[in-house]
Amino acid sequence: INNELKNGFIVQGSQPSKLYGLPKIHKEGIPMRPVLSMIGSAQYQVAKILERLLKLLVNNPLECKDSFEFVNRILNWNIESDREVMVSFDIVNLFTNIPLNETINLCVKLWDNLVEDKTKSLSSKALRELLEFSTKNVPFIFNEEWFMQTDGIAMGSPLAPLMASIFLHNLEQKFNNFNGELPLFYTRYVDDTFLIFKGEDNVSHFLEFVNGLHPNIKFTFEMENTNKLSFLDVLIERIKDKYQTLINRKPHDTGFYSC
């Protein structure tokens, strides 16, 4: 590690991470989304620096960065068949099911393959040790009791979206092993995926395939209804030979944002 990085990793006056829940008010039963607030912890500072360094490892054309990019992609898609069907896939509890050892190995492998002259900033050995420190065996407090996260990556860690992206990109590279008809259109935002299939009969076969790619990862799906499907905050409608989009607001969306 060079001196600049070493100084950045030094943390003084750190505090433990704290777990809290965010209610998913748009879902039945209002389940809680576990979020680990790591701000102020030693792991948070290390994770922030690693996230900045590892961004260059992520270059996945299947991902969209936001709703605007998704809309641009879908509006430029020309319908190829009158049997086309829109489907959205959602991964069940993605972050807590990411296998840490496997994903850390992927990060180190990509670092070895893509980073030239990497010894100037961070060796592969140091990268592995820092990734393990900032994601594995992370102590946290919940309800005034101490716990330790041993697998999965905490929603609240600066590394969570990046490591999820690297892990899922590795799964997506296995799509070439699918012996059926691949989706005509595929794009993903974190754990939400929008797909267009040539016909409805292709959906179940592909869903079965992706659900067999990794024991930790399970996909659920939603089919279009009356030529319409919601994805992110967008409502997509198929009209003649084009797709059109509208802003889609969830039933509990007030339109206000907290400061």
What annotation goes with each model-predicted range?
Residues L62-L213, E224-F231, I239:
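Conserved polymerase palm-domain catalytic core
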Residues E132, F221-C259:
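A conserved non-catalytic segment of reverse transcriptases
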Residues I30-P34, Y44-V46, V58, T96-P99, ...:
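Short helix/loop capping segments that flank catalytic or ligand/cofactor-binding pockets
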Residues P16-L19, M86, K228, Q244:
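A residue-level signal for beta-strand positions that form part of recognition/binding surfaces
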Residues E4-K6, Y20-A47, M86-F89, F95, ...:
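Short, conserved non-catalytic motifs in the polymerase core
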Residues I1-N76, E84:
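Non-catalytic, regulatory and substrate/membrane-recognition segments associated with hydrolase enzymes
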Residues K24, S37, L195, V234-R238, ...:
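Hydrophobic side chains in beta-strands
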